[in-house]
Amino acid sequence: MTRTDLWKALEETQLYISKYYATALTDEDKHDQLKAYIEKFVLDNGYLIDGFTDEELVNRLYSEMVEYSILTPYLGASDIDEINVNSWDDVVLTYSDGRMVKTEEHFHSPGHAVDIVKRLLHHSGMIIDNAMPIAQGHLPGNTRITAIKSPVVDEDCGISVSIRLLHPQRVDRKCLIDSGMATEEIMEFLEMCVRYGVSLVVAGRTSSGKTTLLNALLGSIPDDKRIYTIESGARELFLVKRNRFGEVQNNVVHTLSRPSDNGAYNISQEELVVAALRFDPDIVAVGEIRDAEANSAVEASLTGHTVVTTVHSGPGEAAHGRIALLCQRRFELGMEVSLSQARQAFPLVVFAHKCEDNSRKVMDISEVYVAPGGQAEYRCLYRYNITENEYKNGHFTIKGDFEKVNPPSGHLCTILTRSGVPQELLGRFCTGRKEAEAE
């Protein structure tokens, strides 16, 4: 029996495997054999390591050599939304219920952390090194990775990483109503707008529920309407419906951009937006606009297509301002021109927010109408009013209520009428419009 520590055992095992079974490290088809080789080496050497049985040691050494070290068990967890590596010795888990927990284990050293993250990024063909210290990638199974290393972060930090685990799930109106994110009336209004040709943008910060809301709205679209989705790196929109025989029931085209350091292999969201228009879509859904694809999304909407998307911004005017700034990256038309186009392209802005009690709320729905002279008129249609914030025994409690502030404008109601909204349905939302406008 040999008493040692994990890292000494790892070093010796790696040397042994590299010398006698090197191909097993690089050939995925031989990974089962690799584990057997590791097990034999461990048993032959009689390693004794505190806190590990022989089986646990074999699994950990295997994870260190071909998987992702301490991150491996968390990457497949269904109750974890994010893994944040602040530095090699500081790893924080964010659970689906909002809890943030620091892991007891951490990487062995700054270099160890960098090596594991390089392995993570390898799956999407991305490289991180001193020349390119910022990288974004993904893992199979809808996991997004953003990493930064020195010289962007301190040398003794090693590397900082945000890993977001995207869990496929069918979200519908009932889920959002039951969670308190929106009311039935709000969901019905938004579903009507998307179904009958009103482009909208869902704004908010990270983890505010933007994509969850978008999934629910698109899931309400009739199966005969064609939806074309565009996302970056990892899938967040899950819209394909199958019957019990596995047959597809609706009409969806899912696409993913392919970021690459090699320009010849790079496929941007902007290119996919342009391609979408050749697929005769009823709705184009851009998971998130964050760069020059904003201009293509605006143009697609202005040419009569229904476009729905999300953006990191504040509510109403702030969302249009953000979209206009992104459009400027493609064509410098002048901020006023880009702003006017963004407003016309997306007459509805839905603002989602994550509250301190970890609940998500549709805080505001605003409509903008651009008059012939170019003047923009904003009106709040719905909002969530917070009436009480309470912090007690380490927990936040937030109370409030949803309010219908104004009916849609006559301009929006006319668009919906022309698009075929049944009068009975439209009347639920446009009742009182003349009285409101008279005020």
Predicted regions and their residues:
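N-terminal accessory targeting/assembly segments
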Residues: 1-128
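Conserved lysine of the Walker
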Residues: 210
